[in-house]
Amino acid sequence: MRILPACMMLALGVVPMQATGSAEEPSHLNGLWNVSVTIRNCDTGAVIRNVRALNLFVHDGSMSETSSNSRRSNSLGVWRHLRDNIYTSMFEFFRYNPDGTFATTARVTRRIELNADGTEFVTTGTVEDFDSQNVRVSVGCSTETAVRAQ
């Protein structure tokens, strides 16, 4: 008679796995992305820098990001679905001086537009830098293109 409870436990365990799997279909933002970032002067449009990055969007609304720039930390942040294929995200990371000391905290805020088949996205946003007293010391504008990692 212990077979029935064991089968019920097995069946209950399968249901959450199926729900989790469906939340990560390519039509959603969830998952790993290869990102090309361009930071510009907001007033002139002049390119300040180009950066390669990886973004990981998790189904619970959290995200992490890492970039090719060695003078900064990894990023932690949040994202949410607004409507249709439009999302927003915000993440922060630390920038360091050449000697390794703290320089600023950077906050990236962006609007994400996912393409119809869920394989690419583009963004527009801002990058704000804050000093150790949390005073904003600079702001830049950003654009990104991304492809889903395979």
Language model feature labels by segment:
Residues M1-L4:
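Positively charged n-region of N-terminal signal peptides that target proteins for export
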Residues V127-Q150:
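Edge beta-strand at a domain terminus
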Residues E25-N30, L56-D60, R80-Y87, I112-V122, ...:
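A short, structured loop/turn motif at beta-sheet edges
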Residues S89-G118:
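Acidic, glycine-rich flexible loop segments
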Residues P26-G45:
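Tryptophan-anchored aromatic micro-motifs
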Residues G45-I86, F93-F94, E120-F121:
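N-terminal glycine/threonine-rich, aromatic-flanked beta-hairpin/loop signature
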Residues N34-R40, T88-Y96, T124-F130:
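Generic short beta-strand segments
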Residues A6-P16:
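Bacterial N-terminal signal peptides
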